[in-house]
Amino acid sequence: MPGKWISALLLLQISCCFQSGNCGKVLVWPMEFSHWMNIKTILDELVQRGHEVTVLKPSAYYVLDPKKSPDLKFETFPTSVSKDELENYFIKLVDVWTYELQRDTCLSYSPLLQNMIDGFSDYYLSLCKDTVSNKQLMAKLQESKFDVLLSDPVAACGELIAEVLHIPFLYSLRFSPGYKIEKSSGRFILPPSYVPVILSGMGGPMTFIDRVKNMICTLYFDFWFHMFNAKKWDPFYSEILGRPTTLAETMGKAEMWLIRSYWDLEFPHPTLPNVDYIGGLQCRPPKPLPKDMEDFVQSSGEHGVVVFSLGSMVSSMTEEKANAIAWALAQIPQKVLWKFDGKTPATLGPNTRVYKWLPQNDLLGHPKTKAFVTHSGANGVYEAIYHGIPMVGIPMFGEQHDNIAHMVAKGAAVTLNIRTMSKSDLFNALKEIINNPFYKKNAVWLSTIHHDQPMKPLDKAVFWIEFVMRHKGAKHLRPLGHDLPWYQYHSLDVIGFLLTCSAVIAVLTVKCFLFIYRLFVKKEKKMKNE
């Protein structure tokens, strides 16, 4: 009987979808890791609303698993890059970024960062070439007549596929280094006087010295840093599209930019009509915990529990560091649930249980959870915001330093340095975040802000995708600045013209005064001679 009801509801949903004419075909060019987790949340909701979703999956992708998403359709195709190559590259990238990249100033880590990003650019260029050169795949996509393409611009190529298929496309994005893509292709307005550039590790109000550092970072990312190697990508895009173009120009044709952030994490800055903020779209009310885990949580009594997770991308932690962490956790009266996949530390206390996987969102939503020790990835930070849990941040790579810097500035977190952190540092941070009501108060305040939106983040994302499908784009929201070359966008031609006019007027004025002066001098001399 329940099966019949489910079938009936599905039929009703599909019939309503067809009657309203809103059902569509969505093509997806995904990125791996947490990027995929976020975009998958959107795709699952699209399927629930009756849309047909097809995900392009390069064979080199090793995290994205079609078996875990039976409602989505996958087009897997061969690539010249192997899974092992891509996996080894990302493992090395994360480890170098976590333990070797200098973070004193943007200039101190710039050579190593650029070298890592160049490797990323080359791998994705290979994947992109494998995609568009696959005639059988592209013919199949042409025949499918998709209505829209959804992509993450950090994994370039989605915009090229959309252009070849002549369909509109949207971006779902957390950030690009230094806001490079957002500024060069999206024309985002991010004044360095009060908006800390991403990867600077700064958050909130800046001192004079902070603003100097921020300006240096901005100049570096705007003029020296390259997210993608334009010398390789631009000719490739021009060749495929049959006209002179660039990667940045093609990216600039995105109908909407769905940014996986919001004003609970970010500080206010100007925004554009074709940009919307969908941070925390993956967050949900908590589900019941497994019985053994619930029993352990309940055994904590009035002290409650601490959730500890440094994510799944960091492949190594020294035994010394693991023992220091375990010692610090053993000193607090709270029970601890620690996501850890290494050798069991010798200093592990009886109050701590180690798990290879944790239902993180459900634990953070549990009434006994007192604090969250996190690597400060955007997903974990947003789950903590959603449930109003204060944080101890131990950032490692990417924008994690920026995420936790914002939370510290908003009074909902303290932060530690993974490279220099001692066991006493972690112990003191835990005592501060648990015992000082200041942090809990601010975490709850951020949670209230997050929940008090006119539309849920996931609903906003789906709305804009359906909007673009209904109207075949969103050109009326696209600022005219997208169509201007850089010198016109910054009014350099106008400034040059006005400076030239001012110079001409100044020269003419001086010449006129000199002429009049000489005329009077000559007359005076003539009168004296007479």
UniProtKB/Swiss-Prot annotation:
Induction: Constitutively expressed. It holds the Pfam family UDPGT. Residues 1-23 form the signal peptide. GO terms for cellular component: endoplasmic reticulum membrane. Keywords: Endoplasmic reticulum, Glycosyltransferase, Lipid metabolism, Membrane, Signal, Steroid metabolism, Transferase, Transmembrane, Transmembrane helix. It comes from the Eukaryota. Its EC number is 2.4.1.17. It is a single-pass membrane protein. One of its GO terms (molecular function) is glucuronosyltransferase activity. GO terms for biological process: cellular response to ethanol; cellular response to glucocorticoid stimulus; cellular response to growth hormone stimulus; cellular response to testosterone stimulus; estrogen metabolic process; response to lipopolysaccharide. It catalyses: glucuronate acceptor + UDP-alpha-D-glucuronate = acceptor beta-D-glucuronoside + UDP + H(+); 17alpha-estradiol + UDP-alpha-D-glucuronate = 17alpha-estradiol 3-O-(beta-D-glucuronate) + UDP + H(+); 17alpha-estradiol + UDP-alpha-D-glucuronate = 17alpha-estradiol 17-O-(beta-D-glucuronate) + UDP + H(+); 17beta-estradiol + UDP-alpha-D-glucuronate = 17beta-estradiol 17-O-(beta-D-glucuronate) + UDP + H(+). It is found in: Endoplasmic reticulum membrane. It is an enzyme of class 2 (transferase). The chain crosses the membrane at residues 494-510. UDP-glucuronosyltransferase (UGT) that catalyzes phase II biotransformation reactions in which lipophilic substrates are conjugated with glucuronic acid to increase the metabolite's water solubility, thereby facilitating excretion into either the urine or bile. Catalyzes the glucuronidation of endogenous steroid hormones such as androgens (epitestosterone, androsterone) and estrogens (estradiol, epiestradiol). PANTHER family: EG:EG0003.4 PROTEIN-RELATED, UDP GLUCURONOSYLTRANSFERASE 2 FAMILY, POLYPEPTIDE B38-RELATED. Belongs to the UDP-glycosyltransferase family. This is UDP-glucuronosyltransferase 2B17. It comes from Rattus norvegicus. The lineage of its organism: Eukaryota, Metazoa, Chordata, Craniata, Vertebrata.
